[in-house]
């Protein structure tokens, strides 16, 4: 009987190990697909703008008006000084953290949940659209999500076991996550309040437990203070200017919750919430304290984030990323709920349902709509601001056409057969239509920096042509005019800001630099009222000759 039982458990574990392997493979693929060709956009430029004009000390002691993550910017500064600053290197820590979460989180919970729950959970983590997105962007949210989860679990294990290794794990994760982004501190420090409350109910042991909490609090406060006090003292005004400026509504919470769960329809959203509630109830029956601990931390920390009214939190995308540390726990309980629902079915049937249900959830989500090749702007809010076009301001407030005829002509060529340099370029995503154009022409795109030939307005993310900056998806007009096109076939010069009814504060003097471009590259091979296109290669000239 014992041998038969062991064989049954081994067979069950083997099946769920296969599901887990599928989840890891899917997660790695989704996070790495076209990873090296993605264009930096929006907040990803904050670090570059800072390191261009600051040294290590200046970076470490300021938060900045346009907030940047201090540790990541220090990392970027190191890369730039050693000739290695590129898009994929900037994003590499987030990529590794996003992949690590799929494996590390189930490993940390291996003694608390059955294999079916952990394998299902890894699948949900792997295909989570917002986690995939943040694993591919040069912002700290993928790292902080991993670190907050580790910190919360480590604190609970330390509280239960009194093992110093868990305490040190908590201190390290809390220090790094808090330094990466202040918004994580409510999640990181709330365990003290919960455990202090439980300690007060322990009778004569309460003072010993409270003393332990106090000691750990001092230990974690020291490195946090060393890292955060200098920028807090220097930039208190900037922080104050960004707090109490946003607002939260029921609608924004609802849309942010749908974003977090990766759906845009009410039915899958309701099903996922119901499964999470069922899973929390099932877990409560076997380990009530852990559920109470997690629910308290998530609820209070999320409430604290919303009550702080940080800037732009009224946008569902902003609120969703600030609350992302809650998501692994929500998906954990949802996975437990799935295990409960399927518990009476045969093992192979349960595993098959989990895999096919995950595939269906992925298909119903946003990613199939933007994983086409090549798409170098997957992080554009056009795809990420809201997964329902009816609520995405990049659909509802900005034009979605018309697409210039030049791009329709390129669409007749094989995908990925030519390379365009699009100039000028705005780091503000709502002033860039390239995601609309690439969806039509399906060719490779590089960003064109037009300084100094066309002026250098700071708002447009212009940076000088230096050895330190080796962004692969950027081309400098000055280099192109020297004949260094680096594989580009067409230079597309946009004459006017886009969209016309949302003009930027400044726009480079394109008309003023066109004579210089024509003198070096020859006459434009295509022009209309909004653009002039120049051939940079023999291949481009051969393509254009067929149009005539």
List each language-model region with its residue ranges.
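Hydrophobic, aromatic-rich transmembrane alpha-helices
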Residues: 3, 100-106, 195-202, 267-290, ...
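Membrane-interface transmembrane helices that cradle and orient dolichyl/undecaprenyl
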Residues: 10, 111-113, 151-169, 177, ...
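Membrane-interface alpha helices of multi-pass inner-membrane proteins
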Residues: 27-29, 121-122, 134, 166-182
